[in-house]
From Swiss-Prot:
It comes from Caenorhabditis elegans. The gene is lmtr-2. Part of the Ragulator complex. GO terms for molecular function: guanyl-nucleotide exchange factor activity; molecular adaptor activity. It holds the Pfam family Robl_LC7. Regulator of the TOR pathway, a signaling cascade that promotes cell growth in response to growth factors, energy levels, and amino acids. May activate the TOR signaling cascade in response to amino acids. This is Ragulator complex protein LAMTOR2 homolog. GO terms for biological process: cellular response to amino acid stimulus; positive regulation of TOR signaling; protein localization; regulation of cell growth. InterPro entries: LAMTOR2-like, Roadblock/LAMTOR2_dom. It comes from the Eukaryota. Belongs to the GAMAD family. GO terms for cellular component: Ragulator complex.
Amino acid sequence: MLKQKALVDVLGQVNTSGVDGSWLFNKEGLLLAYVGSEQKAVASNVSSALIASVWAALERRANDLKETILVLENGVIGCTLVARTMLLAVKADKSADLGMVRAKLHTLAAYLEQPILSISHDLG
C-alpha cells in the first residue's frame, strides 16, 4: 500500500540541487501528491492539469511517449510515465543540470513503479 506521507517523503527526496518541485498525478491531471517550494505563481493542481494536457497532446503525435522535457523561460519540467497510468514530473530552475534532472526523474519513477502497479492491480 502506498501511504500519502510516505509518498510525499519520497517525492521530497529529489528536491535538491536545483530541483524545486515534484508531482505525481494521473493522465487526466488529477494530483495525487506534490512537494515543492511555496513560491509558486500557479497552484500545484493547476500545474498537474496543464502538464497532463501537454502530455496528452504530445502522446497523440508520438505513439510510444515515455518522457518529455519542457524548457520554460524560468527552468525546465521533466515528465515521465509511471506504471502506464500515472505521470511523474519534476521542475528545476535554469541553473540545474539537465542530466541530473533526468536521472532524478528516472530514479524516482523506477522506485514508484512497483507500488503504483500493485495499487492499480488491487483496484482493477
